[in-house]
Amino acid sequence: MAVGKEIRTQISSINNTRKITRAMEKVAASKTRKAQDRMAASRPYAERIRQVVGHLANANPEYKHRYLTEREAKRVGYIVISSDRGLCGGLNVNVFKKAIRDMKQFADTGVEIDICAIGSKAVSFFRNYGGNVTAAHTGLGDAPKADDLVGSVKVMLDAFDEGRIDRLYVVSNEFVNTMTQNPTVEQLLPLKAEENTELKHHWDYIYEPEAVEILDELLVRYIESQVYQSVVENIACEQAARMLAMKNATDNAGDIIDELQLVYNKARQAAITQEISEIVSGAAAV
């Protein structure tokens, strides 16, 4: 039964694939939990440094730092964060669509765009798409450190300091839960003023060195922390999306195996019926 042999080969092949996707699902689930822990651990630092920056800025209202001053947007920069690997559903495609939609609003008004791509998928996409990629970073792995991103972020901060870009945005995926990841665009520079009564409160701190010098340094650290937080959150999204994609692949493989098994059983039944008919016909002829 040649047909039956082919079907058994297909079933065996798909079953082997199902074993791989099931293993990848379990690995992704483990990495998702670790990524969530890193995300939760880094969030308090990002929030606290934002508060300190707010206190310093309100304590020195006469000092207008360039990162706090709005200016006409003639050229804008985007830090687009993606994964280094695939097999994570539409995670990267969704963030690219979000970035392009936001960029189009500026491009339609003649504003030029610079891109810092983080993650090999973003680098390859925007280089093929034709974007002006001024900085790129790949190979961050599953547990990146803030220092790994300093170089790429510095390229965009230097461009802002020198007036080559007038605004800076970060595009990444927001982790809602293991089933939901939303692509978002956040403005990094200039910093938007927040209506926060706690930040407006006068804090009687003693600064060493001067508050202005601390503010200069903290604003850079703040931008770096925000980008790092976005990268860590995007990694959690990547692992959650991969876990879901591998689960769907495993389930689909099971459905295909069931269908092929049914086809095999029908083919085997037909072959047996034919053999019986031939035996009966032969006996009748005798």
Curated annotation (Swiss-Prot):
It is found in: Cell inner membrane. InterPro entries: ATP_synth_F1_ATPase_gsu (IPR035968), ATP_synth_F1_gsu (IPR000131), ATP_synth_F1_gsu_CS (IPR023632). Disulfide bonds: none annotated. It is a peripheral membrane protein. GO terms for molecular function: ATP binding; proton-transporting ATP synthase activity, rotational mechanism. Its main location: membrane. GO terms for cellular component: plasma membrane; proton-transporting ATP synthase complex. One of its GO terms (biological process) is proton motive force-driven plasma membrane ATP synthesis. It comes from the Bacteria. Keywords: ATP synthesis, Cell inner membrane, Cell membrane, CF(1), Hydrogen ion transport, Ion transport, Membrane, Transport. Transmembrane segments: none annotated. The keyword Membrane applies. Belongs to the ATPase gamma chain family. F-type ATPases have 2 components, CF(1) - the catalytic core - and CF(0) - the membrane proton channel. CF(1) has five subunits: alpha(3), beta(3), gamma(1), delta(1), epsilon(1). CF(0) has three main subunits: a, b and c. NCBIfam families: ATPsyn_F1gamma, PRK05621.1-1. Produces ATP from ADP in the presence of a proton gradient across the membrane. The gamma chain is believed to be important in regulating ATPase activity and the flow of protons through the CF(0) complex. This is ATP synthase gamma chain. It comes from Marinomonas sp. (strain MWYL1).
